């Protein structure tokens, strides 16, 4: 009888897929606690690098207070305009159609206050907020906040437990530190662009990434630093600390074997476009037919592309069977032979000729039947509409208090007990002045009104 009961219980156990779905369903996140609830973060940031760092902490439940310039807000609000100009009722800097979409990706879940860092009244506000905060995140030029009297050395005297994270392009010390930086500068000096794009003999040149990878990667690394510093404070030292993140340093950290290759052999890693210098076949080919020939979007009318990964000798043999070219399979049966530059040119040319009368979906179907790894190159529309990513919450519809219905990226990871979550996308400049400055800085309604009239907040 006991065996029958145990067997029935085992039979009712969910599959691993069912268990994961039940455990990580993003729609249930708001019924669970937050990992960083009670942690207060002061975000004195602009553009993407600093704001994304603070926002990653906000996804985990930290109370992130974003400080912007009065009236105008920070610069990213003025890129890629959207349609709510009412966010700028008192400013002559009103964007033509409102807040930029570029602002959304790096600032969800934050509280928004305005404060002029240059003025004594604004600096006094920062000090009051820092005294009651766990973390300050800042990405102005190195030493700027120190000159204003609100840098780490000044604020740590007010709050010895404060974790202060400075992020910037070239670091706070060294001969190149004084330059300003953006993502594109960081990737360029860090060596990333030098390895991206087609080589000259293919008609190519170094290529930049459309997505600001160095900024978002850097923001994540900054968040890791902060979490480590908080752990050290709470479990070991009892004191805060000062952390620095260099955008260029972070890019260099991602260069794989490029630096060891140069250091040991004096060889500069080359650009190799959509192919791979180490593996073949392991790259992107062009398919000759569009998947959406009737689309009104010009980019969708273009030919499609697909990634094919068949560098294993057995996989390559099957790929040649699909293509119908036994001679190439025999000639390049071993990986050492096909990974050579001239061999790759010949092989990829063969593949593109084979795909010239096919869409990327047709190519994928043929490769799937042969059990060959592949993935059509998707655009943002295809990602947004795919049921897998919708079900997992990678793409979410958000009923935002400012935008209304808004499609937005969800958090990139999942946690069973304390899941990250998306609460709101943004708010107007200074939307939380009364709540935050009244509660934490102790300012009365009369003081808030006076500071607003003086354009200090």
Regions found by a protein language model. Give the residues of each.
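Terminal low-complexity tails and localization/encapsulation signals of metabolic enzymes
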Residues: 1-40, 269, 275-280, 286-291, ...
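N-terminal helix-loop segment corresponding to the beta1-alpha1 unit
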Residues: 2-236, 428, 434-457
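Short, surface-exposed loop/helix-turn segments at secondary-structure junctions
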Residues: 77-85, 179, 261-270, 386-401
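Oxidoreductase and adenylate-handling cofactor-binding alpha/beta cores
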Residues: 200, 219-241, 254-264, 320-327
């Amino acid at each position: 009888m006991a065996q029958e009961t145990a067997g029935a219980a085992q039979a009712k156990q969910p599959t691993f897929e069912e268990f994961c779905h039940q455990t990580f369903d993003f729609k249930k996140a708001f019924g669970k606690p937050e990992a960083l609830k009670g942690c207060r973060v002061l975000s004195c940031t602009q553009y993407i690098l600093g704001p994304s760092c603070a926002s990653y902490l906000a996804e985990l439940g930290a109370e992130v207070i974003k400080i912007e310039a009065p009236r105008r807000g920070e610069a990213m609000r003025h890129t890629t305009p959207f349609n709510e100009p009412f966010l700028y009722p008192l400013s002559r800097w009103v964007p033509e159609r409102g807040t930029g979409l570029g602002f959304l990706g790096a600032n969800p879940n934050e509280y928004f206050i305005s404060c002029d860092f240059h003025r004594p009244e604004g600096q006094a506000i920062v000090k009051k907020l820092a005294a009651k905060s766990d973390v300050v995140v800042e990405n102005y030029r190195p030493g700027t906040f120190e000159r204003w009297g609100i840098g780490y050395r000044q604020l740590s005297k007010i709050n010895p437990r404060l974790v202060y994270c400075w992020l910037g392009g070239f670091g706070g010390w060294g001969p190149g530190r004084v330059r300003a930086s953006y993502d594109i500068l960081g990737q360029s000096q860090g060596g990333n662009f030098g390895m991206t794009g087609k080589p000259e003999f293919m008609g190519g040149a170094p290529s930049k990434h459309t997505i600001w990878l160095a900024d978002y990667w850097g923001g994540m690394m900054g968040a890791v630093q902060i979490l480590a510093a908080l752990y050290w404070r709470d479990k070991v030292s009892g004191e805060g600390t000062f952390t620095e993140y260099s955008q260029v340093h972070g890019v260099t950290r991602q260069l794989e074997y490029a630096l060891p290759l140069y250091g040991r052999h004096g060889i500069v890693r080359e650009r190799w476009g959509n192919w791979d210098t180490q593996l073949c076949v392991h790259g992107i080919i062009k398919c000759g037919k569009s998947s959406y020939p009737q689309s009104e979007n010009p980019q969708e009318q273009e030919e499609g592309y697909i990634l094919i990964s068949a560098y294993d000798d057995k996989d390559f043999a099957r790929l040649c069977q699909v293509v119908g070219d036994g001679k190439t399979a025999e000639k390049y049966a071993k990986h050492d032979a096909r990974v050579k530059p001239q061999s790759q040119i010949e092989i990829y040319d063969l593949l593109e000729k084979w795909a010239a009368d096919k869409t990327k979906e047709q190519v994928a179907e043929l490769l799937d039947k042969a059990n060959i790894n592949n993935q059509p190159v998707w655009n943002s529309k295809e990602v947004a509409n795919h049921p897998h990513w919708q079900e997992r919450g990678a793409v979410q519809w958000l009923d935002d208090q400012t935008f209304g219905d808004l499609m937005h990226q969800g958090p990139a990871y999942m946690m069973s007990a304390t899941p990250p979550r998306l609460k709101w996308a943004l708010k107007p400049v200074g939307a939380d002045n009364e709540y935050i400055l009244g509660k934490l800085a102790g300012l009365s309604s009369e003081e808030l009104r006076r500071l607003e009239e003086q354009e200090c907040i």
